[in-house]
Amino acid sequence: MTENITINMPEIVPLYPLREIIAFPYMVFTIFLKQEDMPPFEEAVLFNNLVALVKLREEPTGELFPALHEIGTLCKVMQINKLAGGGAKVVLEGVIRVRLLAIVQQTPVALSRLEPVREFAEKSMVSEALVGSLNALLKIALSYGRPLPDDVMKMIDFIDNPARLSDLVALYLNLPIDELQKLLETVDPLERLKKVYMHLTNEVQRLQIKGEVQAEVTKKVGKSQKEFLLREQMKQIQEELGEEDSRLGEANELRSKVESAHMPEDVRRIAEKEMRRLERINPASPEYTVSRTYLDYLTTIPWQVSTPDNRDINQAETILNEDHYDLKKVKERILEYLAVRSLKDKMKGPILCFVGPPGVGKTSLGKSIARTLGRKFIRISLGGMRDEAEIRGHRRTYIGALPGRIIQEINRAGSNNPVFMLDEVDKIGADFRGDPASALLEVLDPEQNFSFTDHYLDVPFDLTNVMFITTANQLDPIPAPLKDRMEVITLSGYTDEEKLNIAKSYLVAREVEENGLASMAPQFTDEAIYRVTHDYTREAGVRNLQRNIASICRKIAKEVAQGKKARPIVNPETVSELLGAPKFFDEVASEKDRVGVATGLAWTESGGDIIFVEATKMKGKEDLILTGSLGEVMKESVRAALSFVKANCAELGIDKKMFDETTLHIHVPAGSIPKDGPSAGITMATAIVSLFSGRAARRDVAMTGEMSLTGRVLAIGGLKEKVLAARRAGVKKVLAPAKNKKDLEDIPENVKNELEFFFVEDIREVFVQALNPTSPAPTAATSARTPAGAPPPQ
């Protein structure tokens, strides 16, 4: 059937291009226009109040026609109301679809030539079914809250025309403007009805999902409101019964802790702000636990809690001597601190760094200092630490965040002035998580640590009352800025006499007690302890000495448990019987004087040691072979020594031609142990001169010193450890740089009496003292000796 519409449509009609809306037939709508858009509607009076509304495809850049869609709507101007500010409100009614044929005039008013679009809608079972389904679906959509005006609702119930129904329903679908234009351009009413039905089906599905979500939300909100009401009722009941809300009680408890924590004023303000925030948080929320834990830390940290110092210097000295033998420098420094503290109440805590080989008592000394001062003792190991957060903590935004180890340990100690030991500071690592050594810069700087800010606490904490003690085996790995902040105290290795006293005073009694021999305590003779020290240990400290004494005690305990009689005395024979064959021997004493082999002294983080530099030559092209895992510095020392020898062949009694046809090989056993450092320079030169001159190097002479290219002997470090190593190895004479003569003060008198010291300024003096004069000796320069020094060998 054909939709019959009687309208007197002129051949030419004014045109208004649409941008934001689509006009459908039978649609009554209002648009608001600016003054410059009014001409087409004012001109419509001349064209039976008709105007064509056609949507723009795109903004016109020249001619208007190509920018317009082909299908639009012919509308009737119902009313024009002028607005006070300019422009007008225009009421329009859609009449029919029209096809744009041409633009006959573009300015000042666009005039268009149109033709009506005839719509044919034959009544059929399909169209009737679609109309019925669309009406039913529309009512379902309306049940989800999509309201339509009452007059429209009444109209829909009586419309059975597919063309009119599809246009009317399309107006109220929430479709994009391009989809509406496609519906307008669908001329076949049945096809248009199918599209509208499809869009309405999607809209109903969307409304169903939205309704389900809203129902779920409403259910949850209702449950929350119900819980809230029940809690309020429970609170009222508790108040009537005189009981207190658990949450309120928890908040009151925290508030009283904040008030009694004696926090600094700025920290107190932050704590009170966090308290107010906590009171507003639901206890079931994860944020509640985070806030509660933070407040617990703030209120338990010892902001003003200090341990009173023991200022009795005599008593402090007694305690230090009870716990440790010797270590005069450290004890003197602690007593100095106590003396100043007794004169000045408020002072910054010292930051000490104990450097020395393992087993010399660095860590146990920290405990002794804490006992001396009457303070709490804290120790954390920094060895292998790579995460900066271990020092500074994590920010509270991270799950499971906690303060750093500094704040945690001070909080655990319950005092703001403990003795805090940072062990193994030379073994800190660094990776992508940061550098803990850099984080320690603030902790160990007396000028900054009064306001140390942990990332978790996010408030400053005063560390100036803390006595920080760090320990290290060597200084080189410690970053220079960190080293600069610490007062370095070097702990040297022990002499045999010191080890004997330590064993008698501390180690034997401790191991006898720990191994259940207190009632039958065996007596260790001095000779037995010396046998253990000399034949079963080779160390700077006393750790292995303690292990061997413990081993002897365990073996005696085993004999007692087997029914044997306890040994009342432990003598050297007992030691050999229980510990087996000796593990160490006097390396030098067992050697012979050899050509090309010189004895040097080295320093390691485990103490002093002796090294043998071996030189040999082979016929061949001039070359230098270096083996023994030598570092770059040591290799350069060899080259410098070789260059000196070549340059002074005549003076040293060596044929220079020998170098032209000789391959020189330098080796330092043991080959698997890396070695480096400059102090073996004179040893290298002595081995080379011994080899090419044929003069054997004395086995009982050990040397240490860096050599320059001109033969000057330069100062070295670690002389005490090297001298003790020489003594352990059976060396009789030690050659050292003249500039190290001052270091003799650190060497015990009994050691100085056992060894002969010869201090040299020039390498030629070394050759005189270290090489046997089996061939013409080189000219010697004047030597610097100790007063007790022996004359050079004859």
UniProtKB/Swiss-Prot annotation:
Gene Ontology molecular function: ATP binding; ATP hydrolysis activity; ATP-dependent peptidase activity; sequence-specific DNA binding; serine-type endopeptidase activity
EC numbers on record: 3.4.21.53
Gene3D superfamilies, per the entry: 1.10.8.60, 1.20.5.5270, 1.20.58.1480, 3.30.230.10, LON domain-like, P-loop containing nucleotide triphosphate hydrolases
Biased amino acid composition, Low complexity: 774-788
Active site: S679, K722
Domain Lon N-terminal: 13-204
Compartment(s) of residence: Cytoplasm
Residues engaged in binding ATP: G356, P357, P358, G359, V360, G361, K362, T363
Gene Ontology biological process terms in this record: cellular response to heat; protein quality control for misfolded or incompletely synthesized proteins
PROSITE patterns: LON_N, LON_PROTEOLYTIC, LON_SER
CDD domains recorded: RecA-like_Lon (cd19500)
Induction details: By heat shock.
Catalytic reactions on record: Hydrolysis of proteins in presence of ATP
Top-tier EC class: hydrolase
SMART domains associated with the record: AAA, LON
Keywords tagged on the record: ATP-binding, Cytoplasm, Hydrolase, Nucleotide-binding, Protease, Serine protease, Stress response
Function: ATP-dependent serine protease that mediates the selective degradation of mutant and abnormal proteins as well as certain short-lived regulatory proteins. Required for cellular homeostasis and for survival from DNA damage and developmental changes induced by stress. Degrades polypeptides processively to yield small peptide fragments that are 5 to 10 amino acids long. Binds to DNA in a double-stranded, site-specific manner.
Family (UniProt): Belongs to the peptidase S16 family.
NCBIfam families: lon
Protein name: Lon protease
